[in-house]
């Protein structure tokens, strides 16, 4: 859970840093650059902590994707940037991509283990040895090296 918090903090720091960069370029104030340097550095530090347990592809997709989405919204509100139909389509596609990448990280269901310790592919096979052929024990369709 803490690694997801690190990822959230990385996203927030990236958003603040990038918006500070835009603010500095529009206003000419050095404060924006100073905030940008600290926030972007903090963002990478938090991201590096997050990827210890969060899959890199997922972490990076969320970090960049959510960052782009929120930065675009604030750029329209604060800096008067335009939001064309193509940009909106791109953002919708971005959201879909983030959801697909995130859903691809779900752990597969564990197979039923109540039938014994054999893998599911051989659970239904009989285990009676039917004979030996050239040093190989033949067990109902399975071949095992004879001891």
UniProtKB/Swiss-Prot annotation:
Localization, UniProt? Cell inner membrane
The main location class comes to membrane
Q: Describe its membrane topology.
A: Multi-pass membrane protein
Ranges in coiled-coil conformation:
none
Q: Which InterPro entries match?
A: Small_drug/metabolite_transptr (IPR000390), Small_multidrug_res (IPR045324), Spermidine_export_MdtJ (IPR023740)
Q: Keyword set for this entry?
A: Cell inner membrane, Cell membrane, Membrane, Transmembrane, Transmembrane helix, Transport
Region annotation (Disordered) maps to: 105-147
One Gene Ontology cellular component annotation held by this UniProt entry:
plasma membrane
| Recorded GO MF terms | amino-acid betaine transmembrane transporter activity; antiporter activity; choline transmembrane transporter activity; spermidine transmembrane transporter activity
Q: Keyword Cell division: yes or no? A: no
Transmembrane portions of the chain:
1-21, 31-51, 54-74, 81-101
Q: Residue spans with biased composition (Basic residues)?
A: 105-117
At the top level, the lineage of the source is: Bacteria
Biological process (GO) annotations held by this record are: glycine betaine transport
What this chain does, per the record?
Catalyzes the excretion of spermidine.
Enumerate the HAMAP family for this protein.
MdtJ (MF_01598)
Which family, according to UniProt? Answer: Belongs to the drug/metabolite transporter (DMT) superfamily. Small multidrug resistance (SMR) (TC 2.A.7.1) family. MdtJ subfamily.
Which NCBIfam families does this UniProt record tie to the protein? PRK10452.1 (NF007767)
Task: Give the record's subunit note.
Answer: Forms a complex with MdtI.
* Full protein name: Spermidine export protein MdtJ
Source organism per UniProt: Yersinia pseudotuberculosis serotype IB (strain PB1/+)
Q: What is the lineage of its organism?
A: Bacteria, Pseudomonadati, Pseudomonadota, Gammaproteobacteria, Enterobacterales
């Amino acid at each position: 859970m803490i690694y997801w918090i690190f990822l959230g903090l990385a996203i927030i720091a990236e958003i603040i840093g990038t918006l500070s960069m835009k603010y500095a370029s529009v206003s000419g104030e050095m404060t924006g650059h100073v905030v940008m340097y600290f926030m972007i550095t903090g963002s990478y530090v938090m991201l590096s902590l997050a990827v210890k347990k969060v899959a890199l592809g997922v972490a990076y997709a969320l970090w960049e994707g959510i960052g782009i989405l929120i930065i675009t919204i604030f750029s329209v509100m604060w800096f008067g940037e335009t939001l064309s139909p193509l940009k909106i389509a791109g953002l919708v596609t971005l959201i879909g991509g983030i959801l697909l990448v995130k859903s691809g990280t779900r752990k597969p269901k564990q197979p039923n283990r109540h039938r014994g310790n054999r893998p599911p592919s051989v659970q239904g096979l009989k285990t009676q040895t039917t004979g030996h052929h050239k040093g190989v024990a033949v067990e109902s369709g399975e071949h095992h090296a004879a001891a």
